[in-house]
């Protein structure tokens, strides 16, 4: 080994050790000047001797340009959300459910960092992939940006065949204040809060910008530990620290839920004492075996819950109450407020839901009110301050005619909502289009409300189906578009034709049919044509489809306007069937593990093939594993497969199974 390569290796070890001491142990051993000097020397040597540059070098944290878009990546296991607890009663109920399934319980309580979930994958000890949460199953790969975060090790301190780690990316308060100050001086729009700033920073196409944002990362979960079974969540946190990750030190262990409740009360008062935003606490069953026994619901683990801090309340004035007409015709009263700063952003409006809510709270135009963000997200009026009334306040009355189209407004028996009776109401059509193009529906990027307003005003569209007839020459003159934007929009519209049945059903805006129901109906019927024929009785027999939804779906497809709309979509070439793989499902029902270094394909590609042919690409070996595909340097998974008598295939043997 040459002197240069030895020096480069020594610098890397010094820098990574300094990162571990600073971010992993919170015990810095170098001054900023000493650290910078080492890093600059490493960068210089690698530039002079590029033959020694490696992807896991600390110098690679400075960033560079990325491709024009982030590729999608399927998570090893779904990133489920947590159920929420808002008070002691919710926590007691959680404890009751847990103890009904397991006896002695110990809880770990961790800070709920207000950032964004990031999943990391290490192979042969090196970071190979990092991704956002996305929809929980598929996220965006942002590896290059994540490599700029010093708290994320590029190489593990202990060798591991494969390690999947989850944690929270965040922006410290100090970094956020500096960033907004720089943006203000540059005349750029400010970020509303550190969470939004962190999300925007991680989606930069130039990772050098991400590197400048000084983001942090706290790891809290391991999916595939290589050194035997980790028996508890506290053991997981210790293991993560040993591997070089930054782990939030502010976690506590309790044996009684009453202790947890008391601690939650203490933390409400201390929530602002940290250099980063927290919006609650996460309570987990400590014992991993008990976690497995408790299992999961369709959307969340039964062994964990998020305690959400009470919302911050701020006083302001109701300057006006304005009606907004939604896509189903509901008239929603919105309070226009004197702008105030609450829970990280400036609020100027708050929903009042319906007339019953206004009457119950006695909200009047001109009232002083307390507002908060429900779940620290959605602004709402909590109560009025009657002692501040002057007598000049005005009582709000719901209009008898729709403010958008002047059609009669009705309130059906048993409902709190007032509705516009016209299905051709411009507001309903506008909101229906906005919903149709939204991310979880047809996902037409670049088609925001402002562009939709222009298209409607210019007479280029009347409904969402007309989007598929738009032409380039008609789009270019529009104010918010141009040649490049028009090209991108037309491509996004064309791509949306292949979204499939479930997003299309959701995008239709059928009353009571959300995203989950769209998937259920798509799976049940397979084609739009079959769904159109469905009767109320058979719809009600489908799990999770109640009488109200069944009635709504049947009525929707009985309308002549619905048939006309769907025919326009068909003529445009929109796919109206569930997206089934054309490949034979040779691995259907099989759990398959891929391990080691492969020669012909990379591991992610093999896992994708397994899923395309009907199998499940699992991250760990168990008795349920059908077989293991093993490459070179296969570690503990190969040993466990042999121990359990699980068949082991080489890469070539796996290739021979494929059609």
Swiss-Prot record:
InterPro entries (alphabetical): BRCT_dom, BRCT_dom_sf, DisA/LigA_HHH, DNA_ligase, DNA_ligase_CS, DNAligase_adenylation, DNAligase_N, Hlx-hairpin-Hlx_DNA-bd_motif
Chain positions recorded as NAD(+) binding sites: 32-36, 81-82, 110, 133, 168, 284, 308
Ligand binding (Zn(2+)): 402, 405, 420, 425
EC number per UniProt: 6.5.1.2
Start and end residues of each BRCT domain: 582-659
Gene3D superfamilies with a match to the protein in the record: 5' to 3' exonuclease, C-terminal subdomain (1.10.150.20), 6.20.10.30, BRCT domain (3.40.50.10190), DNA ligase/mRNA capping enzyme (3.30.470.30), Helix hairpin bin (1.10.287.610), Nucleic acid-binding proteins (2.40.50.140)
Disulfide bond residue pairs: none
Chain segments annotated as transmembrane: none
HAMAP family: DNA_ligase_A
Protein name: DNA ligase
Organism: Desulfitobacterium hafniense (strain DSM 10664 / DCB-2)
């Amino acid at each position: 080994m040459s002197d240069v390569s030895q020096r480069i290796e020594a610098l890397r070890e010094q820098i990574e050790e300094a990162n571990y001491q600073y971010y992993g142990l919170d015990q810095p051993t170098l001054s900023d000047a000493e650290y910078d000097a080492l890093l600059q020397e490493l960068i210089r040597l690698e530039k002079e001797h590029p033959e020694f540059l490696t992807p896991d070098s600390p110098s690679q944290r400075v960033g560079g340009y990325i491709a024009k878009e982030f590729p999608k990546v399927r998570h090893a296991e779904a990133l489920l959300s947590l159920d929420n607890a808002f008070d002691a009663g919710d926590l007691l109920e959680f404890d009751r459910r847990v103890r009904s399934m397991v006896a002695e319980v110990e809880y770990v309580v961790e800070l709920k960092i207000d950032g964004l979930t990031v999943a990391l994958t290490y192979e042969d000890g090196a970071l190979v992939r990092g991704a956002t949460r996305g929809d929980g199953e598929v996220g965006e790969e942002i590896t290059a940006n994540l490599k700029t975060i010093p708290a994320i090790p590029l190489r593990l301190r202990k060798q591991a065949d494969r390690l999947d780690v989850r944690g929270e990316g965040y922006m410290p308060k100090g970094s956020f204040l500096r960033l907004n100050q720089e943006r203000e001086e540059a005349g750029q729009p400010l970020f509303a809060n550190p969470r939004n700033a962190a999300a925007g920073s991680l989606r930069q196409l130039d990772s050098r910008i991400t590197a400048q944002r000084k983001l942090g990362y706290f790891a809290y979960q391991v999916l595939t530990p290589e050194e035997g079974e980790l028996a508890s969540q506290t053991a997981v946190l210790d293991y993560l620290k040993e591997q070089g990750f930054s782990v939030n030190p502010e976690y506590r262990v309790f044996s009684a839920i009453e202790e947890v409740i008391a601690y939650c009360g203490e933390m409400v008062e201390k929530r602002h004492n940290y250099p980063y935003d927290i919006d609650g606490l996460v309570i987990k069953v400590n014992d991993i075996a008990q976690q497995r026994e408790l299992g999961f619901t369709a959307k969340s683990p039964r062994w964990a819950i998020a305690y959400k801090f009470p919302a911050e309340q701020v006083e302001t004035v109701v300057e006006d109450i304005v009606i907004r007409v939604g896509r189903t015709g509901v008239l929603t009263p919105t309070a226009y407020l004197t702008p105030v700063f609450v829970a990280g952003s400036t609020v100027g409006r708050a929903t009042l839901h319906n007339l019953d809510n206004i009457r119950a709270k006695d909200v009047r135009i001109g009232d002083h009110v307390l507002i908060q963000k429900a779940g620290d997200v959605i602004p709402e009026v909590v109560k009025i301050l009657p002692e501040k009334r002057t007598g000049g306040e005005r009582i709000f009355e719901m209009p008898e005619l729709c403010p958008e189209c002047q059609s009669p407004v009705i309130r059906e028996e048993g409902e709190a909502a007032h509705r516009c009776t016209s299905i051709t109401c411009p507001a309903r059509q506008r909101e229906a289009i906005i919903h149709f193009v939204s991310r979880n529906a047809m996902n037409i990027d670049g088609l925001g409300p402002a562009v939709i307003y222009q298209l409607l005003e210019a007479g280029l569209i009347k409904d969402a189906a007309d989007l598929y007839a738009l032409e380039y020459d008609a789009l270019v003159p529009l104010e918010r578009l141009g040649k490049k934007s028009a090209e991108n929009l037309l491509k996004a519209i064309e791509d949306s034709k292949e979204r499939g049945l479930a997003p299309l059903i959701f995008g239709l805006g059928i009353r009571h049919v959300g995203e989950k129901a769209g998937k259920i109906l798509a799976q049940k019927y397979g084609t739009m044509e079959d769904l159109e024929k469905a009767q109320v009785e058979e719809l009600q027999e489908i799990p999770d489809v109640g009488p109200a939804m069944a009635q709504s779906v049947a009525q929707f497809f009985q309308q002549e306007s619905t048939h006309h709309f769907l025919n326009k979509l068909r003529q445009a070439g929109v796919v109206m069937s569930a997206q089934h793989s054309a490949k034979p499902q040779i691995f259907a029902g099989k759990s398959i593990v891929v391990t080691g270094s492969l020669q012909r394909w990379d591991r992610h590609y093999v896992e994708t093939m397994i899923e395309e042919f009907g199998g499940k690409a699992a991250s760990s070996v168990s008795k349920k594993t059908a077989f293991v595909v093993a490459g070179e340097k296969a570690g503990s998974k190969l040993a466990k497969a042999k121990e359990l008598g699980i068949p082991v295939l080489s890469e070539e043997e796996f290739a021979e199974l494929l059609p």
